[in-house]
């Protein structure tokens, strides 16, 4: 017991990806070696309340953990509670705002504790679809055409902004919250009316909106793993969505119709280029630990980066662990390597 690493696994969160986080956490918890790790599970409700949870992991998966009051402990001072001070490494299995945007990473830095995942800066940049594209372009990675604005600008002159977007991008246009993942709040607009409606939907999730030109191509993803400064890219995989695009439902509910092909059936040149771009993108945002990088591959062979996910999903159908399995690292080994690498990582802020 005394030789075990004290691991604090954080799940849930306040974002629209709360449910995905819970499923990912369940899958990670299932494979953690109890002989090596003493796990403290820390749940965050959608309202932002923090609880220590000591109940059945199945209740994390189905979201009923908040009702399991016999196994909840709350109303504690996060910084003062000895349970937190005794944690050796934090593993945030969180997605979206307040989870992979640098917010909780800053908390871990203030606690002077190592943690799984990218740091504060890289998490924030990776979460913001506009800033990340600027960084990708700076290192020569092709991006598709895009246009962005903030909510106050939209409310002042939405018709003018719509005119500019149509001229710059043409239809169809993908409308996205700038800071959200798992395709939450994303729509595909085919005309002016759909564009206006799609922006209003996206504004529910963020005050900054990015519009992207449609890229006709295959959706190729690549997993990145960093261990002690060495960055590796997995064999890429392809997503074949059952709908017009790989939306939230297709990613996490529509398992029967949406398909993934690993390795992606692409030529060696494209595969090598995608793996190279994945590493470059990861390094461009100064990433650490892990990320998943998404691309489009057109029929003419052009490659465009879509986005980087600094805390990719770990559900049973998530691409990140599946791509590493195809590359030769099993799910359980992958989780352990990520934790062990985090343990050796120096916290950037020393108090």
PLM region spans:
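ATP-binding N-terminal substructure of ATP-dependent carboxylate-amine bond-forming enzymes
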Residues: 1-116, 120-121, 125-127, 131, ...
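ATP-dependent carboxylate activation and anion-phosphoryl transfer catalytic cores
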Residues: 2-5, 11-12, 87, 267-351
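Solvent-exposed alpha-helix faces
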Residues: 26-27, 200, 279
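Phosphate-binding site of ATP-dependent enzymes
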Residues: 187-276, 297-304
């Amino acid at each position: 017991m005394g030789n075990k690493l004290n691991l604090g696994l954080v799940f849930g969160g306040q974002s629209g990806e709360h449910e995905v986080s819970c499923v990912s956490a369940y899958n990670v918890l299932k494979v953690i070696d109890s002989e090596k790790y003493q796990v403290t599970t820390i749940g965050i409700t959608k309202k932002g309340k923090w609880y220590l949870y000591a109940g059945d992991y199945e209740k994390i998966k189905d979201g009923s953990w908040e009702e399991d009051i016999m196994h909840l402990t709350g109303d504690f001072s996060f910084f003062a509670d000895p349970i937190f001070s005794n944690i050796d490494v934090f593993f945030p299995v969180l997605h979206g705002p307040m989870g992979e945007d640098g917010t909780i990473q800053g908390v871990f830095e203030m606690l002077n504790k190592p943690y799984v995942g990218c740091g504060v800066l890289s998490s924030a940049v990776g979460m913001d679809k506009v800033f990340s594209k600027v960084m990708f372009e700076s290192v020569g990675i092709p991006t598709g055409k895009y246009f962005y604005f903030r909510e106050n600008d939209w409310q002042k002159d939405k018709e003018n902004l719509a005119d500019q977007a149509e001229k710059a991008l043409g239809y169809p246009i993908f409308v996205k919250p700038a800071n959200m993942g798992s395709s939450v709040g994303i729509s595909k607009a085919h005309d002016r009316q759909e564009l206006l409606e799609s922006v209003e939907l996206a504004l529910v999730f963020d005050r900054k909106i990015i519009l992207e030109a449609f890229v006709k191509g295959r959706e190729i993803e690549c997993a990145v793993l960093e261990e002690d400064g060495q960055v590796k890219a997995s064999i890429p995989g392809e997503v074949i969505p059952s709908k017009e695009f790989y939306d939230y439902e297709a990613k996490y509910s529509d398992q029967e119709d949406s398909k993934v092909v690993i390795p992606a059936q692409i030529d060696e040149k494209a595969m090598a280029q995608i793996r190279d771009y994945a590493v470059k993108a990861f390094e461009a945002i100064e990433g650490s630990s892990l990320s998943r990088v998404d691309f489009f591959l057109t029929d003419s062979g052009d490659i465009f980066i879509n986005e980087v996910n600094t805390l990719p999903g770990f559900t049973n159908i998530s691409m990140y662990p599946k791509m590493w399995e195809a590359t030769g690292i099993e799910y359980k080994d992958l989780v352990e390597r990520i934790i062990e690498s985090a343990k050796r990582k120096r916290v950037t802020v020393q108090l």
